[in-house]
């Protein structure tokens, strides 16, 4: 087995590392840099990757693609994609399958393809350093990436000619690098604010075991959003001073973006900077120049709400893990944005401790991926990584209820089965609809996919036993199967949503679940109460058909009256009334049971006496004296 490389496929920059002996090492690229800009450009039928692509972006904005990670696995109609359309100079287009793709040099590319070009650069960088062909890799993704996004990332690896041995969460990879070859036991938080995404994970590290307790995040929050705030500020200031709107000028936008990113970085180490962009545009009076003094205080005011948005996921992650901020013994900062003093200040304020700055925030994720590659390659031993799935997974059941099979923050890989049945008599097929989210009703969650299980033998409802199995692999990718236990017929599917789950949808699911918890609970309770009552009505009617002639008219009348009352209650939306009538019918049914049991016992006693009488035999006998 050859070397397994670790790749941090970032929104803004990417990085590749490999195990050298017992230590992970970041590999320099052809330009002598340890990180590579995640930028692709198409110019004169030539494809440029990394720094060369970034250098020509100002003169070729329409054909220069950056931050494509924010589009990967997303549908074109996703609100976040719509938001990005107004911020980037290149075209985002709708693919035939509904996904968001990009257009450059008169060609359409999927985000997986663009990502593959970056991965190829990482692959070549490693091959040049190692002097051998590289075919296997561990690739990192944001912890809050959904199934479609993980699948699309894995596809990117395949396009790049890499066998992706493992998809690993970025905060987990950072924790691996932080805790590698450290013997102490600690509970840590990894705060990862990168170029396009934010993640926070809570982990317990002890004797080589890295156990993720919870994770949370926002897959559309990062340095790109900070840059956009600065860019919009520059546009507003220039428009106020000159009356010219630069937002419709792709060339000016690209220059403004570069200036915004540069100013943001400078303000991490200085209190003020000058933004000078000569000849930014021109009008009838001649060329116009942009010259603005920009302070750290102004920047902090512009992005204060973005920084604050990272705190709620931290709070939720701690809650899910069952910890308080004071339980965290170390806060590890990951991602270039954590160099910003205001971000560090917010982290310190929330966790009540100075964050750990002993790791390189741009390289630590790739180092962790390389360590995981070493584990899979058996170069590294005595390390056990236990990661989690970020959102609950389940299916839609009778009444539209979302029945969870695997809860969020469940350790992966994980496999869970549950037996369901049919809702109608002689039902020969069932549709399994797979959802992801935190709401109690399936329709309020995200449909990941669906499939049919056909050929179920005719039987009364509730009789067939259909076993549904959810299997999440170590990459966080979902596999679902349904099997009719009587016929042995089985249907399996790897869930591949056409457009993936949007970040806004995921966040909204959790927020809505909290805001609408009472409403969801009542609705779920009503449906479950109705389902139970409906089943009781069905079984009671069946009992009356089969044993009604054995009941007295008084007993039968009482049951029929209770049955009619429950049927009437089922027409309403009153859960308490349905429960009351269900209890009444249950009590009436118990009296039937007592009567039937008594009759059956008497019948058995009578039969036993008859059998005993039949066994009595007359016999002659003779006394024999003992001699």
UniProtKB/Swiss-Prot annotation:
Residues 602-611 have a biased composition (Polar residues). Induction: By stress conditions e.g. heat shock. The keyword RNA-binding does not apply. The keyword Membrane does not apply. The modification Phosphothreonine is found at residue 197. One of its GO terms (molecular function) is unfolded protein binding. Keywords: ATP-binding, Chaperone, Nucleotide-binding, Phosphoprotein, Stress response. Residues 602-627 are annotated as: Disordered. CDD domains: ASKHA_NBD_HSP70_HSPA9 (cd11733). Residues 612-627 have a biased composition (Basic and acidic residues). InterPro entries: ATPase_NBD, Chaperone_DnaK, Heat_shock_70_CS, HSP70_C_sf, HSP70_peptide-bd_sf, Hsp_70_fam. Belongs to the heat shock protein 70 family. Acts as a chaperone. This is Chaperone protein DnaK. It comes from Rickettsia felis (strain ATCC VR-1525 / URRWXCal2) (Rickettsia azadi).
């Amino acid at each position: 087995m050859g070397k397994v490389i670790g790749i941090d496929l970032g929104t803004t920059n990417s990085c590749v590392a490999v195990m050298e002996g017992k230590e992970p090492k970041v590999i320099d690229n052809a330009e002598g840099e340890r990180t590579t800009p995640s930028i692709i450009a198409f110019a004169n039928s030539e494809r440029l990757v990394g720094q060369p692509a970034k250098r020509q972006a100002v003169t070729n904005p329409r054909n220069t693609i950056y931050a494509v990670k924010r589009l990967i696995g997303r549908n074109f109609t996703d609100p976040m994609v719509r938001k990005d359309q107004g911020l980037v100079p290149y075209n985002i287009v709708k693919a035939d399958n509904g996904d968001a793709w990009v257009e450059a040099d008169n060609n359409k590319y999927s985000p997986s393809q663009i990502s593959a070009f970056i991965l190829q650069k990482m692959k070549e960088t490693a091959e040049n350093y190692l002097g051998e062909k590289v075919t296997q890799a561990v690739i990192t993704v944001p912890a809050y990436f959904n199934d479609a996004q993980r699948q699309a990332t894995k596809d990117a690896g395949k396009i790049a000619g890499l066998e992706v041995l493992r998809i690993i969460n970025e905060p987990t990879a950072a924790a691996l690098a932080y805790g590698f070859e450290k013997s102490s036991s600690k509970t840590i938080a990894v705060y990862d604010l990168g170029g396009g995404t934010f993640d926070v994970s809570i982990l317990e590290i002890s004797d080589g075991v890295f156990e993720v307790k919870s994770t949370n995040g926002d897959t559309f929050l990062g340095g790109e959003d900070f840059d956009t705030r600065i860019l919009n500020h520059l546009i507003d200031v220039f428009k106020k001073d000159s009356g010219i709107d630069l937002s419709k000028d792709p060339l000016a936008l690209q220059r403004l973006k570069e200036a915004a990113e540069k100013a943001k970085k400078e303000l991490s180490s200085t209190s003020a900077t000058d933004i000078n962009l000569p000849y930014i545009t021109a009008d009838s009076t001649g060329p116009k120049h942009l010259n603005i003094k920009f302070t750290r205080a102004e920047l902090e005011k512009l992005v204060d709400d973005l920084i604050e948005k990272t705190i709620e996921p931290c709070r939720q992650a701690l809650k899910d893990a069952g910890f308080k901020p004071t339980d965290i013994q170390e806060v590890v900062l990951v991602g270039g944005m954590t160099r910003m003093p205001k971000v560090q200040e917010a982290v310190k304020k929330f966790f009540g401790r100075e964050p750990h700055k002993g790791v390189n925030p741009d390289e630590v994720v790739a180092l962790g991926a390389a360590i995981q590659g070493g584990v899979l390659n058996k170069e590294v031993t005595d390390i056990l990584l236990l990661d989690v799935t970020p959102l609950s997974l389940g299916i839609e059941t009778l009444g539209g209820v979302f029945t969870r099979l695997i809860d969020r923050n469940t350790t992966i890989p994980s496999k869970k089965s549950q037996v369901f049945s049919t809702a109608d008599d002689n039902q020969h097929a069932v549709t399994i609809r797979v959802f992801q989210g935190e709401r109690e009703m399936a329709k309020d969650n995200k449909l990941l996919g669906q499939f049919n299980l056909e050929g179920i033998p005719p039987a009364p409802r509730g009789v067939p036993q259909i076993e549904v199995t959810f299997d999440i692999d170590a990459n966080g990718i979902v596999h679902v199967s349904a099997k009719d236990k009587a016929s042995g017929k089985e249907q399996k599917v790897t869930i591949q949503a056409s457009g993936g789950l949007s970040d806004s949808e995921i966040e909204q699911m959790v927020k809505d679940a909290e805001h609408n918890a009472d409403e969801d609970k009542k609705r779920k309770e009503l449906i479950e109460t109705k389902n139970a009552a409906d089943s009781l009505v069905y079984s009671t009617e069946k009992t009356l058909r089969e044993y009604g002639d054995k009941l007295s008219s008084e007993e039968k009348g009482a049951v029929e009256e209770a049955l009619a009352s429950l049927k009437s209650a089922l027409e309403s939306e009153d859960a308490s009334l349905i429960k009351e009538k269900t209890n009444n019918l249950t009590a009436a049914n118990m009296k039937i049971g007592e009567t039937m049991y008594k009759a059956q016992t008497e019948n058995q006693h009578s039969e036993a006496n008859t059998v005993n009488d039949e066994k009595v035999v007359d016999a002659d006998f003779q006394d024999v004296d003992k001699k």
